[in-house]
């Protein structure tokens, strides 16, 4: 399987070609090159998955871990070194399929969505870089290689979020995303260094005796790594960048939310899962609590947002919370429940990638039709965009957890694992699942039903998107319909052994009833007209509604801390010290040198008489000095 290195190198080659020679190409040619390369990458990924899983398990009954390519990149000292390579195991192969599929759909979709945009070639170059970075992250053979590509993912997202660099909001959003995730990544880097020092390796599978000897340092290292993952996955309170990241092109949002960018934290915990479960189970507990709180917070905020992309952004945050909860509850004393949590998390990552990409690309078609992100500019669009309407409905039903769509299977496995861990956790996550169904159908009815905005529609009649934009919708909708029937546990599990999925009928019945009730409530409130019931509720609970709309003022807290504390109390005194003390000292040296030069410039005047005076004065001074000393 040595050919797998091409899966990483082809997007890199596409980035270099489009980045260096793209401006000499026509936009259509640049798009064709980027899309063709991704099609080859996707085919190679599918063949890799087929070859890997069809080869079967080893004698121990697990899928083997393969490293078809590896090279020592940086020797550090002794046995410690950093390798670059390709690692194939069930979760990395699964992620290759996810990344290549979503990225290919985004590339095809962008041919229509970005047509006529300035910087079209640059856009496709950045997409190729982003794809290469995500692939490098998931096939990394060690934690340091993962960190290198982790940072490349951050750089790529910065470039794509700030693609419209003449737009102030996009520039600010790209800087915000970059800075917030850099703070979290500092914790990740410190954790990696602690881990490497005490474990004696950056490998994902170090020697057991080194970990035992390290004592409490390994849980500390893993906890710091989780901080980095929480930042990348937009967990509260490091979530503030993801909402503003919607300033980038909509296909970029699909790639960020559906592929590896925001699920990188989930993948990190899954990749290091044997270490978490063996040496830091308390960190996994905190992972579950942080995930549950984030899922609830984001679901409440999504219920009152009016921007279609921001509703989907908070939906992503909430769903990532579900994935982290599933990993966190895998510490259950019941081995079956523990394995179920891990498998359910990875299964939900897979299914979520497909229907969330479908939702964002569908949102792009809607924005393309009405030229607005606001739901107030929409309503009644099912008459004008039947294909987008149908595929968007499929995605909404999937994320709500309605049978037989993929979200039903993955979400119910998470809920089953939560109930096995703790009944309280199970009921909390069931309630959040109900909120998910409510806000998604609030969004659905606000876009496709309700009263039309005839004033806007008269000025610009909505229409269905071109074929390059609707084909990816149809493909992703088809995958969303059938993905739930994949025997996922046969391929991906916490220990590599086959895991047979058994639907808990009682949990499934409860979750379906909760989802159906939430959808019925959203239908009653939003389906027929412009939400008079919702307006009355918002007026009755105006304080809560305002707080949720303002995201419970967490952004304002950050604003206060940065401007009133960091800038006013720390940055301003440091700036004063730098300006008056450091610069003052340097200016004093310059003034002293200028003054000395002014005093002695006559020594080089060219006048022999002056030279004689200086000579006699110097001789007299030396004579007096000698007499004083003697």
Give residue ranges: language-model regions.
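N-terminal signal-anchor/start-transfer transmembrane helix
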Residues: 8-23, 104-105, 230, 234, ...
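Hydrophobic alpha-helical membrane-insertion segments
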Residues: 36-54, 184-193, 395-399, 472-487, ...
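Aromatic-capped, Gly/Pro-kinked transmembrane alpha-helices
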Residues: 76-87, 489-506, 527-630
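Hard-cation-handling environments
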Residues: 462-521
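Transmembrane helix-loop-helix hairpins at membrane boundaries of multipass inner-membrane proteins
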Residues: 2-5, 21-125, 197-219, 271-273, ...
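Hydrophobic alpha-helical membrane-embedded segments
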Residues: 45-46, 356-358, 434-443, 515-535
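Membrane-entry segments of alpha-helical transmembrane domains in multi-pass membrane proteins
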Residues: 1-9, 25-32, 80-98, 136-149, ...
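Hydrophobic transmembrane alpha-helices and their helix-loop junctions in integral membrane proteins
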Residues: 105-146, 155-461, 468, 477-479, ...
């Amino acid at each position: 399987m040595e050919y797998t290195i091409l899966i990483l190198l082809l997007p890199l080659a596409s980035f270099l070609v489009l980045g260096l020679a793209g401006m000499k190409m026509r936009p259509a040619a640049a798009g064709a090159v980027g899309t063709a390369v991704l099609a080859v990458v996707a085919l190679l990924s599918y063949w890799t998955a087929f070859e890997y899983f069809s080869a079967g398990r080893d004698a121990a009954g697990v899928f083997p871990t393969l490293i078809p390519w590896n090279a020592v990149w940086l020797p550090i000292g002794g046995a410690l070194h950093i390798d670059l390579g390709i690692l194939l195991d069930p979760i990395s192969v699964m992620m290759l399929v996810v990344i290549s599929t979503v990225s290919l759909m985004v590339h095809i979709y962008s041919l229509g969505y970005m047509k006529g945009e300035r910087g079209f070639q640059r856009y496709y170059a950045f997409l190729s870089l982003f794809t290469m970075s995500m692939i490098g992250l998931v096939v990394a053979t060690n934690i340091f290689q993962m960190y290198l590509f982790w940072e490349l993912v951050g750089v790529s997202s910065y470039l794509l979020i700030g693609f419209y660099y003449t737009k102030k909001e996009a520039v600010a959003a790209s800087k915000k995303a970059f800075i917030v995730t850099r703070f979290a990544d500092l914790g990740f880097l410190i954790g990696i260094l602690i881990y490497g020092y005490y474990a004696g390796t950056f490998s994902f599978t170090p020697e057991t005796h080194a970990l035992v000897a390290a004592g409490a340092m390994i849980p500390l290292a893993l906890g710091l790594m989780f901080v980095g993952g929480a930042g990348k996955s937009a967990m509260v309170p490091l979530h503030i960048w993801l909402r503003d990241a919607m300033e980038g092109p909509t296909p970029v949002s699909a790639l960020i939310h559906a592929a590896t960018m925001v699920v990188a934290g989930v993948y990190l915990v899954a990749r290091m899962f044997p270490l978490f479960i063996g040496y830091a189970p308390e960190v996994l507990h905190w992972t579950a609590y942080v995930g549950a709180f984030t899922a609830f917070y984001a679901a409440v905020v999504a219920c009152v947002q009016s921007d279609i992309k921001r509703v989907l952004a908070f939906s992503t945050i909430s769903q990532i919370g579900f994935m982290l909860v599933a990993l966190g509850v895998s510490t259950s004393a019941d081995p079956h429940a523990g394995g179920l949590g891990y498998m359910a998390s990875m299964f939900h990552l897979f299914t979520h990638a497909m229907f969330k990409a479908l939702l964002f690309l569908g949102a792009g078609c809607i924005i393309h039709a009405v030229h607005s992100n606001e739901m107030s500019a929409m309503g009644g669009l099912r008459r004008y965009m039947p294909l987008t309407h149908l595929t968007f409905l499929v995605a909404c039903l999937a994320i709500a957890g309605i049978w037989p769509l993929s979200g039903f299977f993955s979400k119910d496995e998470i809920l089953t694992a939560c109930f096995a861990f703790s009944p309280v956790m199970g009921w909390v996550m069931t309630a959040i699942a109900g909120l998910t169904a409510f806000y998604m159908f609030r969004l659905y009815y606000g876009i496709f039903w309700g009263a039309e905005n005839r004033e806007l529609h008269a000025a610009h009649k909505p229409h269905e998107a071109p074929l390059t934009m609707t084909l990816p919708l149809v493909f992703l909708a088809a995958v969303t319909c059938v993905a739930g029937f994949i025997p996922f546990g046969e391929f991906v599990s916490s220990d590599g052994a086959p895991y047979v999925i058994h639907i808990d009928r009682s949990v499934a019945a409860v979750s379906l009833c909760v989802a159906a009730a939430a959808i019925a409530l959203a239908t009653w409130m939003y389906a027929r007209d412009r939400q008079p019931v919702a307006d009355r509720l918002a007026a009755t609970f105006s304080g809560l509604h305002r707080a949720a709309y303002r995201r419970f003022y967490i952004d304002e807290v950050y604003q206060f801390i940065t401007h009133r504390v960091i800038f006013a109390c720390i940055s301003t005194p440091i700036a004063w010290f730098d300006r008056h003390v450091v610069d003052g000292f340097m200016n004093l040296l310059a003034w002293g040198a200028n003054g000395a030069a002014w005093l002695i410039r006559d020594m080089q005047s060219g006048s022999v008489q002056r030279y004689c005076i200086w000579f006699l004065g110097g001789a007299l001074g030396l004579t007096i000095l000698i007499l004083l000393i003697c």
